[in-house]
């Protein structure tokens, strides 16, 4: 979800920087999303914005975003710098995505080490067990 939010806000920011209206930029940014749940939520958000609700209030109504996003959007609407702060929100979600991936990899590393150790043990036993059985059959 973090990666999809990153994508949405980055595209949204780039479109706004190039002079596209908020409603058109919102609509175009939704097109690139792959997560069906997020597409549905963003379309619902778009309908709230079309009905005249302020952007930060519409995001609060959806309730899938962090409180930091609400406050950044509120500041963006008051300052008129939505394109800049939406890029900052994109960077925030990119950082959250990278942190989640790092946590997953920290968990995965010992599991992979254990898997390789078991594989080496299996191969070593496959080689040495027949040799030990051969030597036990020979009498001196």
What are these regions (language model features)?
Residues 95-140:
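Bilayer-spanning, highly hydrophobic alpha-helical transmembrane segments
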Residues 1-105:
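Glycine- and small-hydrophobic-enriched helix-loop-helix hairpins
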């Amino acid at each position: 979800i973090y990666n999809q939010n990153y994508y949405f806000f980055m595209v949204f920011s780039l479109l706004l920087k190039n002079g596209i209206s908020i409603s058109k930029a919102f609509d175009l940014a939704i097109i690139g999303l792959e997560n069906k749940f997020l597409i549905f939520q963003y379309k619902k958000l778009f309908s709230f914005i079309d009905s005249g609700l302020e952007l930060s209030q519409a995001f609060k109504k959806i309730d899938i975003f962090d409180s930091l996003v609400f406050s950044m959007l509120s500041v963006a609407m008051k300052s008129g710098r939505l394109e800049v702060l939406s890029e900052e929100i994109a960077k925030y979600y990119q950082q959250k995505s990278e942190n989640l991936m790092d946590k997953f990899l920290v968990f995965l590393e010992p599991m992979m080490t254990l898997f390789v150790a078991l594989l080496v043990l299996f191969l070593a036993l496959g080689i040495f067990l027949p040799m030990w059985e051969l030597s036990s059959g020979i009498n001196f």
